[in-house]
């Protein structure tokens, strides 16, 4: 990257909160996380030059669109800055981050605010599942099921089984690691939840089937929450460091990134990867891109990973696609204890989407 992008800091809401029960709106959520971020960093509103919002389904859950307009409602100093909202399903927050990076790299702005949020616990589970199904190809896939995404990820489990073989005990192990990690996170949705050992078995009482091979403990949470970060050019980061008596080297830098896409339908994705080593080649390619841009040759040069485990099979897929194991051999990293907190490559120390929670538009910003 020609222009280094610095991360000045930010904030995250408590993902255990139910904002509807508190009689608080999506605007209240927006304001709270923004103000927390301003306070924690010491940045003043008049220093922000551009605002980016990550949000997937605010229109459906709350009826609210044009969420970027909340910046000016929250602080009059922000009434003239350019703002935009980004929707890319579960990658909405990450795309908001990348868009802010592009603004800074192009030299248009020096200090960007990126805010991701989702307000989802105001409806029943069935309605929420239908809203989240907007990211499937409507009318083409997941048409005959109660829960679209558990249904879709069950198909991924089945495809893994056909191509490589899979033992669902390894998926249960992933779930347990993430829920255990979440107990250590003061912002995790599940930190105070109790999970008896039977939850990680095929017990229909403690771990009922949702769709196919996908059971309750395999599923990410329906979560309310928001996250906010400030990204800066080197010029703005130097000024911030001087103002706050910091060394520039004390401020984190985004070293690399990857961004790839694939056809909308799962069937199209799987047809494209037929005969190839990886189930989703574009996922392997984006990790290769990110490592290359960051100056790394292999994922094991990193100390660990935060990955998108909306379902346990998603993390299972990530393990081999990032190169930690050969394709289809994610189970080896699990059995060898590599991905737990005591392993040589911890995955999702935060608890991930399973343990920490998954307010969809906030997840990429939080990560």
Predicted features by range, described:
Residues 1-91, 99, 156-168, 189-190, ...:
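Conserved active-site "lid/cap" helical segment
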Residues 45-55, 82-88, 112-117, 169-177, ...:
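Beta-strand segments within the central parallel beta-sheet cores of soluble alpha/beta enzyme folds
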Residues 1-27, 139, 162, 173-177, ...:
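Condensing-enzyme catalytic core mediating Claisen C-C bond formation in acyl metabolism
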Residues 267-333, 344-348, 362:
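C-terminal catalytic subdomain
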Residues 142-191, 306, 355:
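Conserved thiamine diphosphate
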Residues 19-21, 64-65, 123-129, 183-187, ...:
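Short acidic, glycine/serine/threonine-rich loops at helix termini
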Residues 58-111, 115, 119-152, 192-221, ...:
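Conserved catalytic cysteine-centered active-site region
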Residues 168-175, 184, 197-207, 241-245:
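Acidic-enriched catalytic cores of C-N bond-cleaving enzymes acting on peptides and small amides
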């Amino acid at each position: 990257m020609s222009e280094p992008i610095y991360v000045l800091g930010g904030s995250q809401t408590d993902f255990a909160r139910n904002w509807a029960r508190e009689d608080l709106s999506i605007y209240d959520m927006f304001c709270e996380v923004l103000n927390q971020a301003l306070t924690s960093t010491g940045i003043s509103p008049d220093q922000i030059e551009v605002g980016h919002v990550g949000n997937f389904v605010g229109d459906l859950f709350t009826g609210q669109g044009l969420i970027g307009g909340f910046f000016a409602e929250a602080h009059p100093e922000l009434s003239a800055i350019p703002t935009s909202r980004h929707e890319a399903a579960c990658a909405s927050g990450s795309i908001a981050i990348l868009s802010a990076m592009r603004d800074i790299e192009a030299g248009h702005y020096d200090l960007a605010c990126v805010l991701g949020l989702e307000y989802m616990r105001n409806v029943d589970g069935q309605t929420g599942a239908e809203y989240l199904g907007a990211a499937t190809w409507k009318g083409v896939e997941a048409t005959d099921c109660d829960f679209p995404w558990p249904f879709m990820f069950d198909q991924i489990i089945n495809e893994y089984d056909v191509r490589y073989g899979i033992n669902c005990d390894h998926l249960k192990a992933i779930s347990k690691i993430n829920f255990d990690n979440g107990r250590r996170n003061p912002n995790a949705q599940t930190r105070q939840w109790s999970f008896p050992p039977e939850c990680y078995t095929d017990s229909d009482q403690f771990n009922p089937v949702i769709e196919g091979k996908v059971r309750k403990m395999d599923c990410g949470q329906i979560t309310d929450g928001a996250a906010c970060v400030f990204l800066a050019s080197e010029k703005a980061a130097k000024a911030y460091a001087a103002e706050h008596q910091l060394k520039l080297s004390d401020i984190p830098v985004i070293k690399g990134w990857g961004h790839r896409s694939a056809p909308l339908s799962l069937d199209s994705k799987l047809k494209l990867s037929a005969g190839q080593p990886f189930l989703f080649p574009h996922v392997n390619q984006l990790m290769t891109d990110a490592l290359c841009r960051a100056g790394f040759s292999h994922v094991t040069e990193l100390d660990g990973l935060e990955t998108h485990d909306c379902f346990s099979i998603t993390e299972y897929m990530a393990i081999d696609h990032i190169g930690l194991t050969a394709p289809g051999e994610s189970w080896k990293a699990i059995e060898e204890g590599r991905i737990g907190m005591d392993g040589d490559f911890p995955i999702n120390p935060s608890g991930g989407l399973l343990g920490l929670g998954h307010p969809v538009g906030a997840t990429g910003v939080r990560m």
